[in-house]
Amino acid sequence: MSAIVEDMYLLSSSMKMEKQFRKRHHSDSSDDDSSSPKSASPSMDDDRRAHHNELERRRRDHIKDHFTILKDAIPLLDGEKSSRALILKRAVEFIHVMQTKLSSQGKAIEDLTRKNELLEERLLERESSGSPSSSRLPALAVSSSQMQLTMPIIPQMQNIAQLSQYPQQANIIAQSTNPAQLDGLIALNNDAILALLGSFQSVSPSLLDSAPGTPPSGFYPCAFSPVDQQMAVKI
């Protein structure tokens, strides 16, 4: 655009100079004719005419060069023979196309900027709030492991609790049961007690002060203390 403006400025300036030159030439010729027609020197007219022709040639070359540059810059004129009027027409069309593209690209950039801002806000919200799922996973794992440990022990401990609540019935059962069955029942109860103590070892290790494989005396049920076991075996 600046080259076109410069060409228009040079064209207007050259036209002004040509008008001034014509006025001066006309005034000089009229003065020479009125005063003395023979006194005008032909060398001065030739110099002025040569100077004017040089200026006009420079102006035309300048305009021609810039039209060539404009033609090369417009992709719509590739391989097409064009006049100056066609070059200017294609240049105007190309300018309109580029303005449309620039406006659409500007809107796309604004949309992308808005989306990036929304994503940054969501990331900040997630970082500030934290992920609740990750904090719940260890608690769920611990509770499930505790349930797996305690579920096999619960039925056996219920049987022990029932025997401890009714010591007379426990003595009758011990007297009427065979020694082999009684030993198996005692071993089953001991295994249940050891499993229970193993589950509590991480909480209070002081419960397992006795020798390994032998449950402490305080955890025997009333019907199956060490004395009752010996009496039952003797019977």
Swiss-Prot record:
Cellular component annotations (GO), alphabetically ordered: cytoplasm; nucleus; RNA polymerase II transcription regulator complex
PROSITE patterns, alphabetized: BHLH
Keywords linked to the UniProt accession: Activator, Cytoplasm, DNA-binding, Nucleus, Repressor, Transcription, Transcription regulation
Chain residue ranges for the region called Disordered: 18-49
Entry keyword Nucleus: yes
Induction (free text): Down-regulated by fasting.
InterPro entries named in the record: bHLH_dom, HLH_DNA-bd_sf
bHLH domain: residues covered: 47-98
Helix-loop-helix motif: annotated span: 61-98
Keyword match Lipoprotein: no
Phenotype of the disrupted gene, per the record: RNAi-mediated knockdown causes a depletion of fat stores. RNAi-mediated knockdown in the intestine causes a fasting-like transcriptional response, characterized by the up-regulation of the lipl-1 gene transcription.
GO molecular function terms attached to this record: DNA-binding transcription factor activity; protein dimerization activity; RNA polymerase II transcription regulatory region sequence-specific DNA binding
GO biological process terms held by the UniProt record: insulin receptor signaling pathway; positive regulation of transcription by RNA polymerase II; regulation of fatty acid biosynthetic process; regulation of transcription by RNA polymerase II; response to food
Main location: nucleus
Segments for region (Basic motif): 47-60
Subcellular localization, as worded in the UniProt entry: Nucleus; Cytoplasm
Tissue: Expressed in the intestine and in the AWC sensory neurons.
Subunit details: May form homodimer. Interacts (via N-terminus) with skn-1 isoforms a and c.
Similarity section: Belongs to the MAX family.
Name of the protein described by the UniProt record: Protein mxl-3
Organism: Caenorhabditis elegans
Primary gene name: mxl-3
